[in-house]
């Protein structure tokens, strides 16, 4: 995924045009970012994913290879590379629209077989930027391999019991946590009351 980020003092209202202060194109996707950082920290990282046959896809593969992320299991199905349109205001608050293209072309059975075939595997990390079926199969394989499983539930949607029961670490941000708990804000929230059940 590629991040297309515009910085502005004020987020435009519907029908309004405002001037931006800066525009940045960068590598994105929570899974890809975690893979890159892990590789830079010395971990042996394999990325299983899908990018387009466009210039964004070329750049992502080059970036993986440059930092030591193994990209041999990245497929290129002919779709456009997925993008995230990000707007950041003067307070650093962001608003993100994810347009999934190639990401959604991953085959869940292939993902399962790949995870089962990788030697010396210790962790499986994924998020909601791929399909629910891929997450199910990835975590199923991960637990069969006695791996730690980590789920980043963004963009947020309810989490089926089949996924939640195979998740060791759930790492939502503030907004996603509020959605899970059906609350509007963390102000005065008692975290001892947090409940994580299927279909949150």
Give the role of each language-model region.
Residues 34, 81-84:
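Residue-level marker for the onset of beta-strands and adjacent loop->beta junctions
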Residues 1-50, 55-66:
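Glycine-rich phosphate/adenosyl-contacting loop at the front of the ribokinase-like
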Residues 1, 63-79, 86-200:
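Ribokinase/PfkB-type carbohydrate-kinase core domain
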Residues 41, 79-82:
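Short, basic and Ser/Thr-rich N-terminal targeting/leader segments
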């Amino acid at each position: 995924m590629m991040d297309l980020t515009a910085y502005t003092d004020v987020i435009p209202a519907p029908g309004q045009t405002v001037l931006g202060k800066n525009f940045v194109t960068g590598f994105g996707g929570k899974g890809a970012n975690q893979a890159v950082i892990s590789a830079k920290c010395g971990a042996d990282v394999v990325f299983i994913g899908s990018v387009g046959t466009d210039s964004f896809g070329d750049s992502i593969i080059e970036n993986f290879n440059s930092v030591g992320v193994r990209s041999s299991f990245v497929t290129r199905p002919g779709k456009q590379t997925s993008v995230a349109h990000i707007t950041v205001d003067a307070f650093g608050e962001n608003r993100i629209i994810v347009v999934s293209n190639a990401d959604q072309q991953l085959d869940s059975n292939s993902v399962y077989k790949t995870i089962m075939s990788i030697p010396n595997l210790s962790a499986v990390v994924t998020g909601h930027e791929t399909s629910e079926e891929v997450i199910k199969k990835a975590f199923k394989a991960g637990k069969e391999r006695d791996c730690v499983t980590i789920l980043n539930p963004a963009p947020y949607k309810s989490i089926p019991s089949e996924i939640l029961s195979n998740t060791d670490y759930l790492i939502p941000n503030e907004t996603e946590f509020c959605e899970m708990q059906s609350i509007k804000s963390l102000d005065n929230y008692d975290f001892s009351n947090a409940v994580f059940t299927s279909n949150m």
